[in-house]
Regions:
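Conserved Radical SAM active-site core
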Residues: 1-120, 127, 132-143
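C-terminal accessory extensions appended to soluble enzyme cores
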Residues: 2-11, 212-266
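Short catalytic/ligand-binding loop motif for oxyanion handling, primarily in non-cytosolic enzymes
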Residues: 46, 117-118, 154-158, 190-193, ...
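Conserved C-terminal portion of the radical SAM core fold
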Residues: 129-196, 221-237
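Short, surface-exposed amphipathic charged segments that create phosphate/polyanion-binding patches used
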Residues: 123-124, 196-199, 247-254
C-alpha cells in the first residue's frame, strides 16, 4: 500500500481542539498522524516527559521539519500509537498510565548499548540500572511492544568484534526474555560530518566503520548468540544483505509489529 500522506485537520491553537470552517476562533492547519514517533531527535522519556504529557493534554504539539525548517502543528486527534525512542525511559514510567486513558498505546525503542569503558554515552545510568529499567518497562507494556536497540555498532582501537559480541551477549542473556526484537545499526561516519565532528570533539579518533568482512564476521557471531535468545533481529537502514545470518532488512519502526500488537484497535 502506498503511503498517501498524513490526514490534515484544522485546530484551535489555544485549546488544541479540532474545529471546522466557520468557527469564530482563528484556525491553523495541522497534520494528524495515527502513529507518532517521539522522537529520534531527542530523548523525550528521559528529559521531557512532563512536557510531553502536558502537550498530550493540550491535544497537539509543534514540530520543526528537519527537511525545510518549517514549524508544523501536529494534532493528536487521530493518534493511536506513540513510538518512544530512549536510552533512559525510567523517569517516564509514572506517566505511562496517562497514555492509555484515551485508548492510546505505546511502543518503546530502548537503546541499550555497553560502551561504558569508552565513556561514549555520558549522562545515562549505569548499565545494570538500565537493564532493570528495561525489564520494568517490559512488565508494564509487554515484551512484544519493547524493542532492544543496539545502535550504533562500532569498532575502535579498544573495541574489537569479539569485545562487541561479548558485551552484546552479556546484555542479551539478561534481557532476551523481556523482548522479542533486536534492531541494530552500524556506525556510519563518512556520510555524516556531524558524527565526525562529535567524535573528534570527544577525542575518539580511533572509532571507525566496519569493513564488509567485519560486518559478516559480526553477523555470524550475533546469529550464534541468538540461537539461545530466539529474537527477531533486524538491521535498520543497512544496504548489506545479512539474511543469511538470520538478520532481516527492516525499519526501526515496524508497521508489522504495530499491526500485530494492536490488532484489536480498529
Amino acid at each position: 500500500m502506498k503511503w498517501k500522506g498524513w490526514d490534515r485537520v484544522r485546530l484551535d491553537p489555544e485549546t488544541g481542539a479540532v474545529r471546522f470552517q466557520g468557527s469564530p476562533a482563528p484556525l491553523v492547519d495541522a497534520i494528524a498522524p495515527i502513529i507518532v514517533s517521539a522522537s529520534r531527535s531527542t530523548d523525550i522519556p528521559a528529559l521531557y516527559g512532563d512536557w510531553f504529557i502536558e502537550r498530550l493534554k493540550q491535544g497537539y504539539v509543534t514540530w520543526k521539519s528537519p527537511f525545510d525548517g518549517r514549524i508544523i502543528p501536529v494534532s493528536f486527534v487521530n493518534t493511536r500509537v506513540f513510538v518512544f525512542w530512549s536510552k533512559n525511559p525510567r523517569p517516564f514510567i509514572p506517566s505511562l498510565a496517562n497514555l492509555t486513558k484515551d485508548g492510546r498505546q505505546s511502543l518503546f525503542l530502548f537503546t541499550l548499548n555497553d560502551y561504558t569503558r569508552e565513556d561514549l554515552e555520558p549522562g545515562i545510568p549505569p548499565l545494570g540500572e538500565r537493564i532493570r529499567t528495561f525489564a520494568e518497562i517490559s512488565s508494564l507494556i509487554g515484551r512484544g511492544r519493547l524493542t532492544w536497540r543496539f545502535d550504533p555498532l562500532l569498532v575502535s582501537d579498544t573495541v574489537t568484534i569479539d569485545d562487541l559480541l561479548e558485551r552484546i551477549g552479556s546484555i542479551g542473556d539478561q534481557i532476551a526474555r523481556f523482548t522479542e526484537r533486536l534492531v541494530i545499526s552500524f556506525i556510519d561516519i563518512a556520510r555524516y560530518p556531524r558524527v565526525q565532528r562529535n567524535l573528534a570533539k570527544c577525542g575518539l579518533s580511533g572509532i571507525r566503520e566496519f569493513s564488509s568482512e567485519e560486518i559478516r564476521l559480526f553477523a555470524s557471531g550475533l546469529s550464534q548468540l541468538n540461537e539461545e535468545w530466539g529474537l527477531e533481529i533486524l538491521a535498520c537502514g543497512e544496504e548489506i544483505d545479512l539474511t543469511g545470518y538470520g538478520i532481516a532488512h527492516g525499519e526501526c519502526i515496524s508497521l508489522d509489529q504495530i499491526a500485530r500488537e494492536f490488532s484489536s484497535d480498529q
